[in-house]
Each structure stands twice: as structure tokens, then as C-alpha cells.
Amino acid sequence: MSSSFLSRPLVSVYVFAMVTMQLLFMQSVLSLNQTNAYLNHICIKGEGIVKGSSYEGSVKSVIDHMSTYLDYGFVNGAGSDGPTNIYAKLQCRADASESKCRSCLATAFSEIRKKCPNYKGRIIWYDNCLLDISSIYTLAEIDYRHIFNMYNAKDVSSDTMAFNKNTRALLYALKEKAISKKELPYRRDYLYSAGEESLGKKKVYAMVQCTKDLSAKNCSVCLSYILSKLPKCCKGKQGGSVLSPSCNFRYELYPFVKT
């Protein structure tokens, strides 16, 4: 027997496993929010695997309920399958429309079921959303364990030092803007900010975002932590990002978000 409920606060998941990987951005991602490219997924072995046929149906029930509450760009839900608790959260990118958010949830859940069948803990990232499913309830905590980075294959052609410095400054400025926004009802851009900076004849475009279960203080901590990885992951690259289940950033030399 399964049960489920919804609540506005999101759930961060404390987990055992850690996967770090580097990927190249695909050409299909280069358009302005026109695709929903798959980015990465993690099957969390530390939480175990559920035997039996009813578990996936119980998880689907939670996801189906969540799909009706996407006007804010995020939602979390909870339920159970016998003794196994089910917690799920969805965070859509703030510039994604409600229809794109709903479509991303459907795609993410369909794919994570194939990639990590019956896993209690599993996370999947797409260009437009993050879906995090777990058997462990931890509210408003930062997940430091499941972080990965991506970068554009192309290097900056000139003045790499100035490019790195200006990109870093832009990202930190966006972090401050994101955490200073007031949490108004149904505000999609809470804990999110996007902007651009001129670099001679070019511009760098960037965004930062935290999941909305975090406080502004924890959002700042999370973003500062992943921004500290910028030199190692993306130094001299025309584009790059670092993503976790709690926060992420991205920058490019082309516009990729709606402003």
C-alpha cells in the first residue's frame, strides 16, 4: 500500500555515494532554451535497491501529484511503499516556462526509471530541470557529495587571464543578486539570477541558481562552494558549469537563458 502528500518546502538528500565527472557540452545545447539536453544522472547505491514490483508505482504516484504544482518552478513530494519512504524534489530553471517544466519532469522521471530502476536514491539533471528522488528526508541541507562539472570544448582565443577574472566577478555578482531577492509567493526567480558582461567585442552570459528549499544563507554557502571549483573545471574555457543537487552555475559566450 502506498501513500503520498505534497508540501512546499523542498527536501535535500544526504547520501553516501559520490560521482564527479567532466563532460563536453553538446552542440544541441547552444540554442536559447530551445532544447532540454540530458546532462547527467547518479544512481545512489548507498541507499539500496527496493525489491518488488510496487515500488516504482508508488514513486510514480508521488511524481504525478507533483506535476500539478509546477507554477512556482519547483515542488517536492513524499509518500511511502510499505516501510520504504519516498521523497522527491523538482527544481526547474527559473526561465523555463511551466509547460517546459512539466515536460522536463515527465522526461526526467521516465529516464531515471530506466537508468536506475528500483533505486531508493537517484538524481538526474537536464538543461531545464533537476529531479532528486530519495528514501532519506533531510530538509534544507546542502548536498556536497554529488557535484559534477561540464565545460565547452573551445578555449578562449585571447587574454585568458582577463576572461577568467571577469567571468568570476560576474558569477559572484549574480550570486549576491540571487540571495538578496525577497521570497514572494510564487516567485520563480527566487534564489536565481542571470546577467551578462561585456568583454571587448564579446559578451559573457551567466546564471546561478539554488533549489528553493535552501535559505538565502545556505544558498550563498552552496554557490560559494561550487564557484570555488571554477578555476579547476573551466579555466580558459569559453563556457562551463558546475552542478549539484542544491545549486548550480553556468556561463557561456552566447545567450542561453531568457532574461
From Swiss-Prot:
Residues 37-138, 144-256 form the Gnk2-homologous domain. Residues 1-31 form the signal peptide. Its main location: secreted. Keywords: Repeat, Secreted, Signal. Coiled coil: none annotated. Gene3D superfamilies: Gnk2 domain, C-X8-C-X2-C motif. It is found in: Secreted. One of its GO terms (cellular component) is extracellular region. Belongs to the cysteine-rich repeat secretory protein family. This is Putative cysteine-rich repeat secretory protein 25. It comes from Arabidopsis thaliana (Mouse-ear cress). The lineage of its organism: Eukaryota, Viridiplantae, Streptophyta, Embryophyta, Tracheophyta.
